[in-house]
Amino acid sequence: MARELVGKHVVVVGATGVLGARIAAHLAAAGARVSAIVRDHTRLDGASVFQYALADVIDSAAVQIAFASVASVAPIDGVVNATGVVAFGGISDLDDATLARLFAVNATAPIVMLRESATLIADGGFFVNLSGVVATQPVAGMAAYSASKAAAWAAMSAVARELRRRQIDVIDARPPHTETGLATRAVAGVAPKMPVGLTPDVVAARIVAAIIAGERDLPVEAFA
């Protein structure tokens, strides 16, 4: 079902990140009123965002408060989660702290966001999670990262069925490697040499176009 974004209230979690900022900008350009949930509001683009709430996504209580805060200003029509962390290395190099961090940010946090926002999102709205291509095409040397993203993808797929009666689209976006610089900020390991990825602006534009068009899934092929 196609949707109009003009005047709609969309919450972008991670709007200070490279990709999150571009998504917020494209949403604003499409006429949406964009709220941000971030850890550091000083890095926000004031031209794209009209309000913000502070939260670390691995703090479920803070996430709940943040969603309630932005919803108190205007009903929520959609949510986009653009947060994530990455790690590299073989399975023998994986330590407990890295494993816990990957699943906390990439799997548990999106599920908590969906739990806290599901009752706040208006019927006919949407929730977008960026899991990435590794969710369905796991990569050697990135086993835990791939698994954490696959867990989020599975949850999004299940909840999409739960919210179908309310016509809420739960969209899992699985773009290929994107030049966000995330690989240089890995929580562990060193990134292997990668081919040049997509630009963040191209990925952000495609995601916003999918929201407007009412697409329900964005596999890697959708970014070709």
Language model segments and positions:
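Residue(s) in the substrate-gating loop at a strand-loop-helix junction
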Residues: 132
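Active-site loop immediately N-terminal to the catalytic Tyr-X3-Lys motif
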Residues: 92, 139-143
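C-terminal helical subdomain
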Residues: 172-173, 188-224
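N-terminal Rossmann NAD(P)H-binding glycine-rich loop of SDR-like oxidoreductase domains
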Residues: 16, 24
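Conserved NAD(P)H cofactor-binding loop of Rossmann-fold oxidoreductase domains
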Residues: 82-88
